[in-house]
Amino acid sequence: MPAEKTHLAICNLTKEQYPQIKTLMDQAYPGLGGAWPSHTIFRLIDQFPEGQIGIVDDGVLVGIALSVQVDYGRFSNPHTYEDIVDGHDRVFSDPEGDALYGLDVVISSTHRGMRLGRRLYDARKELCRQYNLRAILAGGRIPRYYNHSAEMTPMEYIEKVDHKELYDPILSFQLSNDFQVKRLLKK
C-alpha cells in the first residue's frame, strides 16, 4: 500500500478495538494459538492503558504494541516468559515498576514494509521518557532459528543475525531498533 494513500495515527488501544486486535494476532500467530483472550487484553488496558499502543489507518487498526511495567532489577536478570505471562491468561504488570517490558508487536500483513513497527517502538521510547522509566526490556522469539539449529547454537545464530549474515524477522527488527541481546530466556 503506497504511503501517500494512508492516514496513519498512533492511539492507545481500547477495549472496543478487541475484535481488530484479535484479527491481527490471529493472523500473526496462527500456529501459536492466535490472539490472547479478551479478558487478558482488557486487563492490560486496565492496568497500563498508556502501554497498549496501536496504529490506525483510516480508523482501522493495522498495528499493535503491548507492554507492561516491571521492576528492572527483577526482569533485567534471568527470568522466564511465564514470569510475565501466565499462559496468555494473566499478565503481570507492576504500577511501581521502573522499566517497560515489551510483550508483543504485531503489524498487519497489508501494512508491512511501512516502518510501522519502528513507529510503535518510537512510541514506547517516548512513553519511557514521559514516565522516566529506566529501560525497555523485551523477550523475543527467533523464529527462523529452526532452519539452522542442526548447524549452530542459538547464540551463534544470534551473532550471525547481529552481523547481518542471516535475517530473522523478529531479532533483526529488534536489533535495528537499538536493542541489545543480553541472554537467552528459558522456556
Regions found by a protein language model. Give the residues of each.
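Short amphipathic alpha-helices and their capping/turn segments at secondary-structure boundaries
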Residues: 57, 87-92, 122-133
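Short alpha-helix
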Residues: 167-177
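Conserved acetyl-CoA-binding loop-helix of GNAT-fold acetyltransferases
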Residues: 107, 113-129, 135-138
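Conserved acetyl-CoA-binding loop of GNAT-fold acetyltransferases
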Residues: 30, 133, 175-184
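Short amphipathic alpha-helix that is part of the acyltransferase structural core
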Residues: 1-43, 47-76
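Conserved acyl-donor/pantetheine-binding loop and adjacent beta-alpha core of acyl/acetyltransferases
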Residues: 65-104, 122, 138, 142-167, ...
